[in-house]
């Protein structure tokens, strides 16, 4: 980011504080999807677990014997550790990285600022986003915008369908919004390097 700083005139920082929705495909692409239950408890892990996670983040179908060679454990030990991480909610899914453009879909980011959302309305918003056929990922944020939504759509009409649905359910609450289209992906990771250095 520092290399680009002289060219950046304005930027916004949004800090994610809670997920609303998190899917691999929008419901318009795959009609049946059950989201994994996430366990909310603190679990311990060590450098071997982190090395296993780093390996899986780069290749989720890598054989456990190959991971075992990389991290200095037996294949049985890797299998046991992955099973434990699943049970403890550290690993919730093994997911492919999808080239949506190759499937003739586009990704849009919808940034919204809501006013006057009480707990009940936030729950309604979460339910709406989880059932919206175009929503891929949505989170509650802190910053200029308090909600960030990624839409996976075939055309701009589907973007407007989702936006109009939000306006219909929250007519007075949407105080500002911005729509961005993803042109090129520079980086996407499920396991940032800061975690692998712990």
Protein language model features and the residues they cover:
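A compositional/biophysical signature of low hydrophobicity enriched in polar/charged and small residues
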Residues: 1-198
């Amino acid at each position: 980011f520092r290399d680009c700083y002289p060219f950046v005139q304005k930027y916004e920082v949004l800090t994610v504080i809670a997920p609303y929705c998190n899917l691999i495909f929008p419901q318009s692409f795959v009609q049946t999807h059950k989201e994994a239950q996430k366990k909310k408890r603190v679990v311990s892990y060590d450098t071997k677990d982190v090395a296993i996670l780093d390996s899986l983040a780069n290749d989720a179908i890598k054989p456990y014997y190959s991971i075992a060679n990389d991290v200095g454990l037996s294949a049985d030990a890797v299998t046991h550790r992955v099973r434990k991480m699943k049970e403890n909610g550290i690993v919730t899914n093994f997911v492919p990285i999808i080239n949506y453009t190759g499937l003739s879909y586009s990704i849009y980011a919808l940034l919204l600022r809501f006013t006057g959302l009480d707990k009940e309305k936030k729950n309604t918003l979460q339910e709406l986003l989880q059932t919206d056929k175009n929503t891929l990922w949505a989170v509650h944020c802190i910053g200029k915008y308090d909600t960030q939504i990624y839409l996976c759509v075939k055309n701009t009409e589907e973007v407007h369908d989702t936006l109009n649905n939000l306006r219909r359910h929250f007519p007075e609450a949407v105080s500002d919004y911005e729509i961005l289209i993803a042109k090129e992906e520079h980086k996407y990771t499920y396991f940032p390097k800061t975690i692998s250095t712990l």
